[in-house]
Amino acid sequence: MTISTLLLSPNRRLLTCLSRVPSPWLLHSSHPAPGPPGALPNCFGHHCTKRVLLSDGFRRTLCVQATLKDHTEGLSDKEQRFVDRLYTGLVKGQRACLAEAITLVESTHTRKRELAQVLLQRVLALQREQELRNQGKPLTFRVGLSGPPGAGKSTFIECFGKMLTEQGHRLSVLAVDPSSCTSGGSLLGDKTRMIELSRDMNAYIRPSPTSGTLGGVTRTTNEAIVLCEGGGYDIILIETVGVGQSEFAVADMVDMFVLLLPPAGGDELQGIKRGIIEMADLVVITKSDGDLIVPARRIQAEYVSALKLLRRRSEVWRPKVIRISARSGEGITEMWDTMREFQHQMLASGELAAKRQTQHKVWMWNLIQENVLEHFKTHPSIREQIPLMERKVLSGALSPGRAADLLLKAFKSRH
């Protein structure tokens, strides 16, 4: 009797007996999932083949395997070896492979982006298997950090990150660095402001230029998060430039959104958009030391009162306001305890898992919008008309809305 026949058998006692058979026998007797040469024991193919006999979810597992096969069929031998090398090195925790993989997903070259999607599909499949073994709960914690310039984000991350690595965590910091709209250049200076943390072998800091994207969050931030998690980093910090739309973009990528604010004078609440405060799961008043302790306490009280008037986004969590000092270390431990409390409550209620699923849909639609716009602009029939339409809009001959309608009609007529 073949394995496929046994899978269709209604005799669950027989399947239970088979589940006790050592994994190597299963791999030899059944059709193993495609996997990289020399893959690790915990690689995707090994677990999926065993899961076929262990649960009723084998149809979904086989579907994922078929998807992986579809992705790899068009690869040359050289490309397959390249993806295999990156994947194997990534799951082994090799920092060089992680850096190379992030560089691959950041590439604008069409073929390299296709290879990046193959790699991401394999990492996501492994991540899904690990979550299934953890009762469907995420194994990592994603935190978005934002705040106005001068709030002390980099100083805080270094102090906070060192505390986490000393506790045995592996930390990845994705620091989105603003690019020049004129030259496209970027300083990428976050590592120079986190000297001690950048030397820590349990921390990985990756500055990423925005390349002029709106809001300061790169197109590939989601992909970089997944790759860092595949590389064994259990805490991911995403630091944004804090210039408006970046906060809304990063909120669709993280489990917890933390807003860092300095103790300043004047109308503080008027300077922060209401929507940004509503998104915050935790408001942190930084630089609460020395002469700034009194202003920090006043700002804390103002935000506590303000948050009471806002609609809660979670049924189990009410946003809190705390004070910290990265210079003295005061409040850093309490802040981490608050963040862990948030994570535990969201996991227990199931809100965190639901949030991750929603974020995957947002991720997909964001990519669709970006790719459709790129395809529209580069379409031969549209590319020739764009300069003409722009001149007519500037001269007042056409309204922007009318020009857009004409371009869209021309685009539809060619399809």
UniProtKB/Swiss-Prot annotation:
Q: Which UniProt keywords apply?
A: Chaperone, Cytoplasm, GTP-binding, Hydrolase, Mitochondrion, Nucleotide-binding, Transit peptide
Q: Give its E.C. classification number.
A: 3.6.-.-
Its gene is Mmaa
Q: How does it assemble?
A: Homodimer. Interacts with MMUT (the apoenzyme form); the interaction is GTP dependent.
Name it.
Answer: Methylmalonic aciduria type A homolog, mitochondrial
The record lists the organism as Mus musculus
The reaction(s) catalysed by this protein are: GTP + H2O = GDP + phosphate + H(+)
Question: What role does it play?
Answer: GTPase, binds and hydrolyzes GTP. Involved in intracellular vitamin B12 metabolism, mediates the transport of cobalamin (Cbl) into mitochondria for the final steps of adenosylcobalamin (AdoCbl) synthesis. Functions as a G-protein chaperone that assists AdoCbl cofactor delivery from MMAB to the methylmalonyl-CoA mutase (MMUT). Plays a dual role as both a protectase and a reactivase for MMUT. Protects MMUT from progressive inactivation by oxidation by decreasing the rate of the formation of the oxidized inactive cofactor hydroxocobalamin (OH2Cbl).
Q: GO MF terms on file? A: ATP hydrolysis activity; GTP binding; GTPase activity; identical protein binding; molecular carrier activity; protein homodimerization activity
Homology family: Belongs to the SIMIBI class G3E GTPase family. ArgK/MeaB subfamily.
Transit peptide (first-last residue)? 1-62
Sorted alphabetically, which Pfam families does this protein's record hold?
Answer: MeaB
Query: A cellular component term (GO) from this record?
Result: cytoplasm
- Return the InterPro entries for the record: AAA+_ATPase, GTPase_ArgK, P-loop_NTPase
Q: Superkingdom of the source?
A: Eukaryota
Keyword Mitochondrion tagged? yes
Task: Provide the activity regulation entry from the record.
Answer: GTPase activity is stimulated by MMUT.
Which sites bind GTP?
G147, P148, P149, G150, A151, G152, K153, S154, T155, D289, S325, A326, R327
